[in-house]
């Protein structure tokens, strides 16, 4: 068992019954020229987050944790995104941006596009699981719950973008399904102003889960090897 120092209190888990969730580390969310950038969100500070996720993934894999990567998006015709009868049609900033800029149609969050791809620095390895998701929560219309339950996994460690949207949505849904969720705050990034990051982390540590950081996580898994991993 491993005890991780976190807020508001430490949490103990078995790494081999824990999954590291990497949420939407796609060009859309982390790279200039991607969806968030084109929609007016600041992605200029995502590079350290990518590096921290690399470090966390390496440590988690060495400890025997399952790594699950998510990619948010839809088919090239956006059928999966929903039409006017879906609130997603009205609230998705990607869909709204494409309606305002028709030349982007088919380029934002479309499966097979550069926007949809994971950033170059983050490459899933054999044994990892890569799943698509059509909405903010990684539990909605995906086999995530079944995958976790069949492996006896009850603890989830979250990284990715955006903290206040897809990361928080997934952790909340996991909480309702009786999963213990931990966010590594320096391996996440918000969509919007910095206060959105702070608010999301406050919500998580106060109501739904725990908050820690990459160095503490790596040190808890293998205190003697963190320097080598970093």
Curated annotation (Swiss-Prot):
It holds the Pfam family Isochorismatase. CDD domains: cysteine_hydrolases. The active site is at 24 (proton acceptor), 133, 166 (nucleophile). Its EC number is 3.5.1.110. HAMAP family: RutB. It comes from the Bacteria. One of its GO terms (biological process) is nitrogen utilization. The gene is rutB. PANTHER family: ISOCHORISMATASE-LIKE DOMAIN-CONTAINING PROTEIN, PEROXYUREIDOACRYLATE/UREIDOACRYLATE AMIDOHYDROLASE-RELATED. Coiled coil: none annotated. GO terms for molecular function: hydrolase activity, acting on carbon-nitrogen (but not peptide) bonds, in linear amides. Hydrolyzes ureidoacrylate to form aminoacrylate and carbamate. The carbamate hydrolyzes spontaneously, thereby releasing one of the nitrogen atoms of the pyrimidine ring as ammonia and one of its carbon atoms as CO2. It catalyses: (Z)-3-ureidoacrylate + H2O + H(+) = (Z)-3-aminoacrylate + NH4(+) + CO2; (Z)-3-ureidoacrylate + H2O = (Z)-3-aminoacrylate + carbamate + H(+); (Z)-2-methylureidoacrylate + H2O + H(+) = (Z)-2-methylaminoacrylate + NH4(+) + CO2. This is Ureidoacrylate amidohydrolase RutB. The keyword Hydrolase applies. NCBIfam families: RutB (TIGR03614). Induction: Up-regulated by the nitrogen regulatory protein C (NtrC also called GlnG) and repressed by RutR. Keywords: Hydrolase.
């Amino acid at each position: 068992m491993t005890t991780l120092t976190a807020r508001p209190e430490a949490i103990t888990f078995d790494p081999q019954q824990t999954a590291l969730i990497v949420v939407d580390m796609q060009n859309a969310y982390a790279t200039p020229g991607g969806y968030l950038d084109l929609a007016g969100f600041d992605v200029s500070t995502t590079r350290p987050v990518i590096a921290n996720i690399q470090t966390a993934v390496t440590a988690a894999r060495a400890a025997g944790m399952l790594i699950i990567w998510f990619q948010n998006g839809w088919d090239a015709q956006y059928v999966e995104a929903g039409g006017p009868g879906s609130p997603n049609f009205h609230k998705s900033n990607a869909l709204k941006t494409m309606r305002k800029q028709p030349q982007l149609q088919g380029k934002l969050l479309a499966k097979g596009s550069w926007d949809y791809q994971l950033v170059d620095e983050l490459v899933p390895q054999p044994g990892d699981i890569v799943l698509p998701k059509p909405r903010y929560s990684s539990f909605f219309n995906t086999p995530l719950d079944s995958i976790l339950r069949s492996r006896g996994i009850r603890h989830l460690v979250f990284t990715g973008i955006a903290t206040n949207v897809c990361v928080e949505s997934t952790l909340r849904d996991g909480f309702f399904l009786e999963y213990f969720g931990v966010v590594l705050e320096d391996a996440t990034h918000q969509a919007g102003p910095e206060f959105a990051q702070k608010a999301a982390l406050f919500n998580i540590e106060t109501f739904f889960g725990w908050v820690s950081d990459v160095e503490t996580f790596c040190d808890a898994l293998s205190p003697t090897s963190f320097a080598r991993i970093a």
